[in-house]
């Protein structure tokens, strides 16, 4: 694996119509060194009946790593939905599980710089040891 910048296939590349193992195998066969994983794709793997240990075993079987976790949105909202709060925590768990030190986040809303800066500070505080 490239030490500094592993070649990573985006989680979106294979969509959501394949199993976790099919995703990892396809990425390996295509020459990628790592996969990006969305919180939704991780939950899909759990819904397949996989546990964290199973997911890690599949990654090891194909000599692959999760190198990117995504995607936190609506983090600057004053009143975030339960689903967004849970997804954020899921992303934090995934970072710990896979040893990933960053999360892709998006901001689709239009806020003032001051509001955005404050909400980013709060997000970083929630991320705690993952930052």
Please identify what each model-predicted range represents.
Residues 11-17:
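Short polar catalytic/cofactor-binding loops
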Residues 36-60, 107-111:
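Glycine-rich, proline-tolerant flexible connector loops at the mouths of alpha/beta enzymes
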Residues 5-11, 35-37, 66-71, 103-105:
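Hydrophobic faces of well-ordered beta-strands that scaffold small-molecule active sites
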